[in-house]
Each structure stands twice: as C-alpha cells, then as structure tokens.
Regions:
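Extracytoplasmic/periplasmic substrate-recognition and gating elements
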Residues: 273-278, 315-394
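Long, aromatic- and glycine/proline-rich binding clefts that accommodate carbohydrate-like moieties
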Residues: 329-336, 383-450, 454-456
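Hinge/lid segment of periplasmic solute-binding proteins
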Residues: 38, 110-175, 218-222, 321-335
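C-terminal motif of bacterial Sec signal peptides marking the signal peptidase cleavage site
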Residues: 19-22
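Extracytoplasmic/periplasmic solute-binding protein
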Residues: 158-171, 176, 200-256
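Early extracytoplasmic/lumenal segment of secretory-pathway proteins
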Residues: 43-47, 52-114, 290
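Glycine-centered hinge/linker elements that transmit conformational signals in sensory
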Residues: 204-206, 251-285, 329-330, 334
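Conserved C-terminal helix/tail region of periplasmic/extracytoplasmic solute-binding proteins
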Residues: 417-536
C-alpha cells in the first residue's frame, strides 16, 4: 500500500516544484505590428489616464478633446480617468501590468516608461506608427489636421526615445523657473542680474534671513515668518546643480555617479545656508507659492507649469485673499553657476500607448493619442499654465502668437507671470537637457532629491553634518532606493530575476521527465485495473 501512495505523492511534489519554477517569468503580449487598415466596422472602447493640476480648465479641455475626437470617430469611445499625481498613475500602471489591464493611453514620464518596459511588449514602440503613410504623424487617412513628424519640436521628441525606440510622444513641455519677489530684493539693496546665479541667490537669501528688527520680525517683510529661498522639486535642484558643474549623475547605461565630491560639496553648502535660515524645501515647509504670495519668500523655484499659482495677482491660490502682499514678480531661469552657458531641465508630460492583444485596439488608441497633438488641444492646454506646445505647428500658429502677445492683458488667460514662464522656455529650448532613461532612473531621481531633503532636515534639527554624516547618508540613500541593484525592479514591482541559472534549467529538464513518468504510471494503473476487471 505504501508503494502505491509514495509514487503519486512524489510525482505530485515534483509537479509542484515545476509550477513554482514556472513563476520565474510571466507571459507577455505579442509584439505590435501596424494593421494594413483601421477596421471602422468595429466598436472600440479605450481608456485614457491623465493628470490635471487641480485645474478645472484642464479637465474641461480633456473632455472637449474626447467629445471632438468621438465625433470624428464614432466607433471609438474614450473613457477618462483623472489623477492629481503622476506617482499614482505610475503605481496603478505597475499594478495593472501584472493583470494585463493597463490603460490604452496614459500621461506619464519617460523614467516611468523605462520601468514599464521590463514587462514583455507592455508598451507600444511608436516608430512604425510615426512613419505609417495612412495613420502616422500627419497621415493621409487621419480625420483631423495633425502634425507631421517634421513639425514636432525635435528636442522634445528626442526625450521620448530610449531603449532603441520612441516609446512616447511629448504632450506638453515645461521647465523650472525662479519666481522672484523683485520688490523685496531691491529693498535689501540688490539689483537683479540678467541671469540668476547661485552666488547671488544665496547672498541675498542669507542677508534677508539675517536682517531683523528689534521686535524680532524680519526687516524685509515686517513679519515673523520668512523663508527666503524655497525649492519645490529638490531632485531637479540637485540634478541641475550637478549638470551645471559638469559633475557625474549617471551614465546612459545606468551607472550611478551621483555620490561624488561635487555632490558632497554642494550638500555642505546647502547645509550652511539652511543653518542661517536662508533655505527650505516644499516637503519640509510647504508650497513655495504660498510663502511667495504672502511676502514670506524672495526666491521660489517651481515648474513653469505652476505659474498660475505664483505672484501677488495669481489667479490660483491656496491662501486667502487677505494674506496676499503686493509686489513685483520677476520670472527668471533657475540659478546658474555659469550664467554665460545656462543649463536647465526639460520636463513635462508625455503620452504612452500600451500594447494589447488586438492591434486594431492599439491603432484606435494611437489615433486618439495623436489627436491630442492637434493645434486645438495643444494651444488650449498650454494656456492653462506656463506650458509650451510640443509642435512647431502650434507654436507658430497665429492663435498661439496672439496669445503670447497679450501678456498681462488680464490676470486670468493672459496672466503675465504665466506667459513670461512660457516665454522663458521658448527662449531657452536649446539650453535644456534631460537625464538618462533606464529601468531604475526614477529611483535615482528620487535619491537626488532625498540627499538635499535629508541634509536640510538634519540641519534644522541641529544635527551635525560632517564627513561621518555624509558617509551614512550615502549608504542610507543607496539602500533606500536600491541604487546598488541596477535594473533590479521589474514592471510588476518584483525582482527582475534574469535568465534561469544552469541548475534551475537542469531541474526543469528533469521535471519534464516527470510528466512522462506520470503518464506511464497512469497507463500502467489503467491496464492493471482493466486486467483485474477482465479476470472477474
């Protein structure tokens, strides 16, 4: 009896091992190929995940774009899902990759797409679609007037090319700007230079923090609160500082270079200015615009895509009207180490098209994504903030040029700070740069900001920032963001295991034979059973 039980049990155990080994990888989609034609006899429902900056006008533009597109393509229905944070879109996409329930189109960033690409054929490479005569950029079969590939701003399109293909198209572009309370800077006896430098910003910020009245209030604003220099995205702060210094950040292949002597020197400098009360960050103190508009900040660095929140006449605000202080707002490039050769980051949302089992569904999604590049959508959306359109077709249009020309005509559509922010990027496209994109680049970006955040917090807590502190900081940030495990994260959030090792392959071969043994065993048992039945 024991012999009869042992063999099936052994085979079952070995089969379980085979199942576990099968978990090493997951089934991917088939590679996408462009259909010969779009099947208009079918109905399609596609999902579009988008971000809005808590801006109702942006939501209205999305909805109008969807309505107008559906009028052109009645057989394509678009469902919109809105987010207020790019990180949440990223996390939800990662979650849905494992169940093949990704959206058809989503607004995202190249760093995020690089992680999506660790899943097999998850994201649609767009080069063949770009070039398709009928449905590509400016294609002959399109029912709208979309841009040709030559009409895309080349620097913006290039940002969407990595891992050998274009995996996105740019939707909007922005950069960072320094929004300056010019009135307070001049009250301290300084004159703004043509190009901001780090030395100037630190000097003025230190002076503002040090100048107090006998009653303890700050001399420049007469208030008890003053944070002279506030930076919203400290990851960009560190990245731009390193770029301007010509120091290492990372290579295109993903080699981490950020832990260098220049980084350490920059962190010591930030610590020194923080100790004097000159510097803080969004994560530590709050939204820079709130302090700027209340007369509690002189230099507020934020995206040009946040320009409608900046200045004493800002149309959008998180503070009450009675907290506003009247001052002149200057919109300037981020501080530079070499003002003769300014360098600033290029950023902004891009459109990613996800692969599906049905290539017709992918084509329907591409038709919608491409519609978002039309002048109507590009110009309308760019006017909601200090964005710029990503096509020369839109930038050079009479409608957009008229919009720029009306800078300051009102404090809503033509709000001067917003249009100045857009012009800042338009004038500096050739001075922008992007960071390398690869699986893990998003983690390195977060780590860059974490270095500044941790140093700033430590100084405010009166902790010593010295060589021992720096060594510990580097170790903790490396561990937190797994920077010593390049490419270690797969699209589903698990470890990317890579090829099976030789012993595992041998085990799989052995287990393959188990199936044969099970079949033989089952056959033998069946023959024995029939023999016993015949003998009776």
């Amino acid at each position: 009896m024991m012999k009869k039980v042992r063999l099936p049990a052994l085979l079952l155990a070995l089969l379980s091992l085979l199942t576990l080994c099968g978990c090493h990888g997951s089934r991917g989609q088939n590679a996408f190929s462009v259909p010969d034609s779009f099947d208009e006899s079918r109905q399609y429902e596609i999902t579009f995940w988008a971000k809005n900056d808590t801006n109702k006008t942006q939501v209205d533009i999305y909805n109008k774009a969807i309505d107008d597109f559906q009028a052109l393509y009645p057989n394509i229905s678009v469902r919109l899902r809105l987010y207020t944070d790019y990180g949440k879109i990223y996390n939800d996409v990662i979650t849905n990759i494992a169940t093949n329930t990704t959206p058809n189109v989503c607004i995202t960033y190249p760093d995020h797409i690089a992680t999506y690409l660790t899943g097999a054929n998850v994201v649609t490479p767009l080069d063949a679609l770009f070039a398709d005569e009928q449905y590509g950029l400016g294609g002959s079969a399109l029912r709208y007037d979309g841009p040709t590939q030559a009409e895309m701003i080349p620097q913006f399109l290039e940002e969407c090319s990595f891992s050998g293909s274009h995996y996105a198209v740019p939707f909007m572009r922005s950069t960072e700007a320094c929004y300056v309370n010019k009135t307070y800077v001049e009250a301290l006896g300084y004159e703004l230079p043509e190009t901001l430098t780090w030395d100037f910003v630190w000097e003025v910020s230190d002076a503002a923090a040090a100048a107090k009245k006998p009653d303890g209030t700050f001399a420049v604003n007469g208030q008890e609160v003053l944070l002279p220099f506030i930076y919203k995205s400290t990851d960009n702060m560190m990245i731009q500082m390193l770029r301007q210094k010509g120091a290492g950040y990372s290579t295109d292949s993903g080699e981490v270079q950020i832990f260098n002597d220049t980084t350490e020197a920059l962190l010591y400098g930030i610590a020194a200015h923080t100790a004097g009360g000159a510097f803080s960050t969004f994560k530590i103190s709050g939204y820079p615009a709130n302090f700027l508009n209340a007369g509690q900040c002189l230099f507020a660095v934020d995206s040009t895509a946040g320009a409608t929140w900046m200045g004493s006449h800002a149309p959008l605000s998180d503070i009450s009207a009675d907290k506003y202080v009247d001052f002149e707002t200057a919109v300037m490039t981020v501080p530079q180490f070499d003002p003769a050769h300014p360098q600033m980051i290029s950023q902004g949302p891009s459109l990613c098209v996800f692969n599906k089992d049905d290539p017709q569904e992918v084509l329907a999604a591409w038709l919608f994504a491409q519609y978002l590049l039309t002048n109507e959508v590009q110009i309308a959306y760019s006017q909601t903030e200090g964005y710029v359109p990503v096509t020369a077709k839109a930038q050079q249009s009479a409608a957009y040029q008229d919009y720029l020309a009306q800078e300051g005509a009102d404090d809503t559509l033509h709000y001067d700070v917003k249009i100045k922010a857009s012009k800042l990027l338009l004038d500096n496209v050739d001075n922008t740069f992007t960071t390398p994109v690869y699986n893990g680049s998003a983690s390195l970006r977060n780590a860059a900001g974490q270095l500044i955040e941790d140093v700033t917090k430590s100084v405010r807590r009166k902790e010593p920032v010295d060589a021992a502190y720096m060594a510990k900081l580097y170790d903790s940030v490396t561990s937190l963001y797994r920077l010593d495990q390049r490419g270690a994260m797969a699209a589903d959030g698990s470890q990317a295991l890579g090829p099976l090792p030789a012993p595992a392959k041998a085990l799989l071969i052995t287990l393959g034979g188990v199936w044969v043994l099970m079949a033989v065993y089952g056959g033998v048992q069946l023959i024995k059973k029939k023999s016993r039945q015949n003998s009776h």
